Each structure stands twice: as structure tokens, then as C-alpha cells.
Amino acid sequence: MLDDILLQVNKPGRYIGREWNLPRKDFDKADIKFALCFPDLYEIGMSNLGIRIIYAILNNLPDVACERFFSPASDMEKILRDRNTGIYSLESRKGLREFDFAGFSLGHELSYTNVLNILQMGSIPLKASLRDQSYPLVIGGGPCALNPEPLCEFFDLFLIGEAEEAILEIIDIYRKAKDRFKASVMKKQDLLVMFSQVEGVYAPSLYEVRYDSAGKIEEFQAKTGGVPAKIKKRFLKDLNSAPFPSDWLIPYIQIVHDRITLEIMRGCPNACRFCQARPQYFPFRKREIDNILNLADSAYKNTGYEEMSLCGLSVSDFSGLEELLKRLIALFKENAVSISLPSVRPKSLIGDVSALIASIKKTGLTFAPEAATERLRKIINKDFNLEEFLKVVEQVYLSGYQNIKLYFMIGLPFEREEDLDAIIGLSTQALELRKKVNK
């Protein structure tokens, strides 16, 4: 039946699974089944580093089978609904109800309807209060878990903060309680109380939240004893010891970020007022260079990818960036592996850094002024020196780059018309420098 369906949809590679480096787990022999759900298309979800990390962590546990669910595209969804066929996992073609957990990555608010759609297509009651022991426990994590209340009716648990350690503690609690829970000897609320002892876990049904007339939280208190009065955000203290996937899954179709992603740091030392990511990933931590090189070497040998992206909120603030680039270039000098960076701060490219990057990849560099006037940059607390930026842009063009990308935000508080006009002016200045260099 699946082969018949795949002949009728665009990009059937989204639904076949069986990628290179896929862990071989026997679903039926696993004591605990975890559905890892990403509420968007396959090619977006497989570009998400968090999904890859949690997937590797859980499948490294001998008694756990972690399998992936992604939102189907509209053509696939229509066929599944017309045939009254539920959504299924990529690995074993199992339905969502056959799992102990359904864990959702909540990356942005626009995916919330996809969360509900996946639950509905998996024949799971949407409201947590309607789900007994026969249904999977629904967990939410990721950036949007910082504000869980809009989804509190639908989730049994939220994991506030970073999941690498906490998910193991959740699994360990469930491992010890599963038989009693599934036999209805243990009530669901009692199990949730046990989960609430894990730092970072918020079980909405254990708390009462009151709102004022404007919809803001007025009071937050526990309904029962034995649960934390406040939920603390969970974070890793040592990024060097954090698990990272070495057996990088290689999809059969092109995905959004079709390369190896190396997380070299987490958190950010800057304090831009517009940024949600800084409090989400606070405090600032970095990996040691030797650790990064080992991860890069392992990922390359297991994949053959010819591009690696250094990942972090502000990679240019990584101390030792120049040394890291030199050693990465030396490591892969015989393999033609290119190294790419996200948006960089101009001052980080002073010296040899821009030339190093240009020696391995000249497709483009990205800068993020965010606002084109100094007045507005001060309001959002964006550290960006215009004179320094223009000098670096000229240096970048001299290094061999032909394209740079500039990020700006529109709609900031206290924005004026002249702030928008200045975007054109700043972009033109950068363009004129390229013309000057190329004369």
C-alpha cells in the first residue's frame, strides 16, 4: 500500500526513511518507544540539529526505540485522510498510538497547528485531560517551550531548556514506572508528579494559572504538594561532554541544510534586546577546539559531506576562531571540504579570518546590522560600528568574495521612516565598495 501512495505524491523521499547511517533497532523488542515529532516537512526537520541530537541520544539506549514523525505535505495528507490511514513513523511504519511518548520540537508558533494535526492524524485526543494510560505521553520542548501556556491543554509535559540530560532522566523514571502505569495501577497524575522532580519539567495539569483581564499571568501555583513551586530552565554545564551525533543521517533528497552542522558554542555573550535565543540558551558556553576537530573528523568519515557549517548564535565571538579555521583547513586539505559560517560580526574578520574563510569558500558572507541607523541600533542594543563594518567589507571583497548578505529587521519599536530609508543607503555603500575593488 505504501508503494502505491508514494507514486502519487511529490518528493516521495520524504516518507521512505531508510537513510544512510540509520540505527537498526527492533521496534517490537524495545521496552520503551519514543516518537520524535517535528511539526513541519521532512526536509526542514532533518535540518534541525536538536532533532538529530535527541534522536541519537535515545537510540543509544539499548531498551529504547526512537522513531521519527514529520508533518506530511498536503498531497500526502489528503491521501492518508481519504484512505483513513493514520500518520506513521519513518523507521517501522508504526502508528503514533503504538508509542509510549510523543515528543514534539516546538521551534516557532506557526507550527502549533501542525502539532495538533499530527496528533489528530495519529488518532490521539488533542486535550491531555482526555488521554489515559493507553495513549502516549505528549512532551514539548524547544524554543517555544519557554512560553508553554498557549499549548498547555494539549501537552502532558514541557521540557523548559536543554534536553540532553533531562530526557534521560525522564526515560529512567518511566522505565521504572511503566508496568504499573500501563496496568492502571499508577494514575497518570502520579506519574506526572514523578516527572516534575526532573529540573526543567513542567506538567501543566499539576498547576493552576490565573490570568488578568489583559491575558497576562497573574498567579501561578501548584495544585498539589510535592511539585516545584517554580520551574527552573534546564541547561548543560559542560558543552564538551554533551552528546553529539557521529552517525549523521544522510537523506536521499536535498534538505534545507544539506551539510554537516557543527555546534561550536551555545548561548551568546551579547545582549541584543530583540533576541529570544540569548535567554533560551543562556549561559554562554563553548566547545574546546580539539573536541570540535574530533566531531568534524568523525562526521566527515561517516558521511562524506563536502560542506560543514560552524553553528552558534554568534560564531564570530568564539575565542580562537582563527586557530579553529586553520586547523579545520589543515584537517580537510586533501578532501576539498568547505567551511561555512552563519552571520558574522565585522570586528571578528579583522586580520586573517576573512582570508582564511575565503580560501575555503567564496560563495558569500553574511552580516547582521539589524538596523541601518545608529539611533535604532542603540535602542535594540546592537553592537555594530559602521566605520569598522565598511572597512571589513572592503577587506572581504579584496579577499575574493563577490557577494555579501545583510540582515535587517523591519517593524522594530520606535522605528521611523528614515530608518527604513537608511537600509537602502547602507546596502548601496556596501555595493559601491565592491565596484571600487573590482575596477
Segment roles from a protein language model:
Residues I5-A35, Y42-E43, R210-T261:
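N-terminal [4Fe-4S]-dependent radical SAM core
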Residues L36-C37, D297-K439:
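Conserved SAM/AdoMet-binding glycine-rich loop
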Residues C275-N291:
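Iron-sulfur (Fe-S) cluster-binding segments and ferredoxin-like electron-carrier domains
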Residues S71-A222:
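Glycine-rich beta-alpha loop elements in corrinoid/cobalamin-binding modules
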Residues C37-P39, F69, S105, G141, ...:
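Short hydrophobic segments within beta-strands
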Residues F34-D40, L58, I250-Q276, Y300:
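N-terminal pre-triad scaffold of radical SAM enzymes
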Residues M1-L41, G45-A65, F70-S74, L80:
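DnaQ-like (DEDDh/DEDDy) 3′-5′ exonuclease domain used for proofreading
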Residues L58, D156, C268, I292, ...:
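Conserved, mostly hydrophobic/aromatic
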